[in-house]
Amino acid sequence: MLQHFSKVLTAAAFLGLFLSVAGSSPREQVLDDYKNGLGPGWETKSFAGHTQYTVENDGKRFYIKATSNTAASGLFHKIEYEAKEQPILRWSWKIERTKTGDDYAARIYVVFPSLLFWKTSALNYIWANKLPKGEALPNAFIGNAMMIAVESGNGLAGQWLHEEHNIYEDFKKYFKTEPPKVGAIAIMTDTDNTGESVTAWYGPIMIGKDAS
């Protein structure tokens, strides 16, 4: 029960971070290329311990390495733009292994703020442990966040995978309405529920107009 209550607070607090966002975005952009470390647009929010987020380079790419040990903290970037104008979200990621319970080795949030907190919504692109690839379900602790299984299980663990999703179409599909403006994009690797350790890697995130 305490773990479930903690998860509710985590989800609600995370969505609540993005109620005040300003600015605009260019037609197409890389959110951050990490070549000079984490850019100034990133902020961290801890809910249970601290997931360590560091920038590394393997000679082929710059990426964020996320290491979680019984922790749940997110790294988020406030950015405002219309999902209909820039619907494509691209990223690459890699995991060490998937986790059990309500923890996910890797996830990317797209947050759609509302002045009414309970109407703030989010698309969560996850590397799932049990949910089959391509399936989605509401977050178990907060109903206005959809969990979308982009990858699932350990079959491709240890490999860099390149992903692409149309957030405009996804929002309409899962929430049955037109999306408000995007307010933030975030990454999160957590193990506060399982009490284990996990490592994940995130490449640069691209926001664009056209699918590849």
Predicted regions and their residues:
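Solvent-exposed strand-to-loop "edge" motifs in beta-rich extracellular domains
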Residues: 92-99, 168-170
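Extracellular beta-strand ligand-recognition surfaces/modules
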Residues: 103-108, 143-153, 157-199
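Short carbohydrate-recognition loop motifs
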Residues: 54-74
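Extracellular/lumenal carbohydrate-interaction signature centered on repeated Trp-anchored short motifs
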Residues: 78-89, 154-157, 178
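Beta-strand acidic-aromatic groove motif in beta-rich domains, primarily in extracellular
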Residues: 99-112, 120-122
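Extended, low-complexity, turn-rich repeat/linker tracts enriched in Gly/Pro/Ser/Thr and Asp/Glu
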Residues: 95-102, 114-116, 193-195
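Extracellular beta-strand elements of beta-rich domains used
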Residues: 34, 185, 204-207
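Extracellular carbohydrate-recognition regions
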Residues: 25-47
